[in-house]
Amino acid sequence: MTQAPPSPQAEGRKLLRLEARNSETPIERKPEWIKTRAKMGPEYQHLQNLVKSEGLHTVCQEAGCPNIYECWEDREATFLIGGEQCTRRCDFCQIDTGRPKPLDRDEPRRVAESVRTMGLRYATITGVTRDDLIDEGAWLYAETVRQIHELNPGIGVENLIPDFSGKPDLLAQVFESRPEVLAHNLETVPRIFKRIRPAFRYDRSLDVLTQARDFGLVTKSNLILGLGETREEVSQALRDLHAAGCELLTITQYLRPSPRHHPVERWVKPEEFVELKDEADEVGFTGVMSGPLVRSSYRAGRLYRQAVEAREGVTA
């Protein structure tokens, strides 16, 4: 789950029926373990000053991600592409739904230059779903990866993509840009999937990962806890993801962005996240990050290196 900055378009518009129902439940009080301490190392402080002086934009900073201190210290950052509005609505997501502005074809170049200016070692690219476009935004996702690689030789790039309606030709276009990691987030379990992600399909999301695996890419996904799933359903989702070809996994606690979003059904204790990591390791994932404040791009470069080491071990 990659957070995005609040969309100004969401302010003042009429609430959807679902949003009105969600708003009847007050924002939940967070438990004691949902907090982080700011550890501002030299790399973080350097990037913070650089981003401010150069007028750069990252999801990390604009969404107030709790992991920004660790990720920036590792010279890792996440960028949102495709605009501020998404053509689909997921009940956990902070990005507003609506009619996006025309595609900005210069965006890949600007993102690549931001990556170079920041001197990043690893960059994650994520963005909105663009069902309004013939190619659903496939060119944009692919071109951004290409531009980053061209301008920043040796950098790792993670491409966190929508499902592109599961169309093999669109997915292949994205795969051919050869990101170090191809990520597509499953997010939740089958029983509540349609309620939480009505424009996506559980099986189709798994198939996106399978197609990426078959193409030869390192694959990654995310599960959000606290949306109404059961522990047994999470275990099954782990097995489904691994069977689909997913190698890397992040598991996180749902934090409600606003009253119009899905209420938090439960606060998962830290020890359960530890248990789930152990279970995912046993299932066969090559890299797992599991914790209340983990996000899908958290320590992304470290997870990628684990996948590379695992693959090298198999071929050695």
From Swiss-Prot:
Its cofactor is [4Fe-4S] cluster. Disulfide bonds: none annotated. It comes from the Bacteria. [4Fe-4S] cluster 1 binds at residues 60, 65, 71, 297. GO terms for cellular component: cytoplasm. It is an enzyme of class 2 (transferase). Its EC number is 2.8.1.8. InterPro entries: Aldolase_TIM, Elp3/MiaA/NifB-like_rSAM, LIAS_N, Lipoyl_synth, rSAM. Gene3D superfamilies: Aldolase class I. Keywords: 4Fe-4S, Cytoplasm, Iron, Iron-sulfur, Metal-binding, S-adenosyl-L-methionine, Transferase. [4Fe-4S] cluster 2 binds at residues 86, 90, 93. It catalyses: [[Fe-S] cluster scaffold protein carrying a second [4Fe-4S](2+) cluster] + N(6)-octanoyl-L-lysyl-[protein] + 2 oxidized [2Fe-2S]-[ferredoxin] + 2 S-adenosyl-L-methionine + 4 H(+) = [[Fe-S] cluster scaffold protein] + N(6)-[(R)-dihydrolipoyl]-L-lysyl-[protein] + 4 Fe(3+) + 2 hydrogen sulfide + 2 5'-deoxyadenosine + 2 L-methionine + 2 reduced [2Fe-2S]-[ferredoxin]. The keyword Iron-sulfur applies. Pathway: Protein modification; protein lipoylation via endogenous pathway; protein N(6)-(lipoyl)lysine from octanoyl-[acyl-carrier-protein]: step 2/2. Binds 2 [4Fe-4S] clusters per subunit. One cluster is coordinated with 3 cysteines and an exchangeable S-adenosyl-L-methionine. It is found in: Cytoplasm. Its main location: cytoplasm. Residues 72-286 form the Radical SAM core domain. One of its GO terms (molecular function) is 4 iron, 4 sulfur cluster binding. Belongs to the radical SAM superfamily. Lipoyl synthase family. NCBIfam families: lipA, PRK05481.1, PRK12928.1. This is Lipoyl synthase. It comes from Nocardioides sp. (strain ATCC BAA-499 / JS614). The lineage of its organism: Bacteria, Bacillati, Actinomycetota, Actinomycetes, Propionibacteriales.
